[in-house]
């Protein structure tokens, strides 16, 4: 089995990665950090991956996160995915990111997803978090990390 950490470079994603590694040591499971990088430039700006007006290179984002993951823990496997455009006209970028995470989780036979999010899982689900939609899938457990410490 595998533990999966959706990684967007935020402090909470780093905290989720550290918690997943701690948990993995008790269960002897592999940890995969997954960065989902859509073509949506505004999504990259909202996440702080690029500054407004800065050229957006999704491959450069993948490379940057791969290096960060290796600095945090070189035993973690890094994976970067680019979601295809949705066939549904009302789908948001978050929907595409969530679908990509679910697909990878199924492919890797994930036992637990560790999500770093300030607002995932609350009664009202914001559209900016993948935590809420991921927590509805019973194929795996979800550990939501809300604090960095």
Which residues are covered by each model-predicted region?
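Small/aliphatic-rich secondary-structure junction motif
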Residues: 2-47
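Amphipathic coiled-coil/heptad-repeat helices and related helical stalk/stem segments
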Residues: 16, 97-98, 127
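Active-site phosphate/pyrophosphate- and oxyanion-stabilizing loops and adjacent acidic/basic residues
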Residues: 21, 102, 132
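Alpha-helical structural signal in soluble globular domains
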Residues: 23, 68-72, 133, 137
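Short glycine/serine/threonine/alanine-rich loop segments
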Residues: 29-30, 74, 110, 140
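Hydrophobic/aromatic beta-strand patches that form the interior of the parallel beta-sheet core
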Residues: 32-34, 81, 114, 143
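Charged, low-complexity cytosolic intrinsically disordered regulatory segments
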Residues: 40-113, 123, 148
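Gly/Ser-rich helix-loop-strand patches that form or flank binding pockets
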Residues: 107, 111-149
């Amino acid at each position: 089995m595998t533990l999966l950490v959706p990684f967007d470079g935020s402090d909470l994603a780093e905290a989720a990665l550290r918690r997943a590694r701690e948990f993995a040591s008790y269960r002897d499971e592999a940890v995969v950090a997954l960065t989902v990088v859509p073509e949506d430039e505004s999504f990259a700006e909202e996440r702080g991956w690029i500054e407004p007006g800065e050229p957006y290179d999704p491959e450069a984002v993948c490379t940057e996160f791969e290096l960060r993951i290796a600095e945090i823990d070189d035993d973690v496997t890094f994976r970067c995915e680019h979601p295809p455009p949705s066939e549904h006209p009302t789908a948001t970028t978050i929907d595409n990111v969530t679908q990509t995470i679910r697909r990878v989780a199924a492919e890797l036979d994930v036992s637990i997803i560790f999500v770093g999010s300030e607002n995932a899982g609350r009664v009202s689900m914001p559209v900016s978090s993948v935590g809420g939609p991921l927590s509805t899938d019973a194929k795996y457990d979800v550990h939501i990390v809300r604090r960095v410490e």
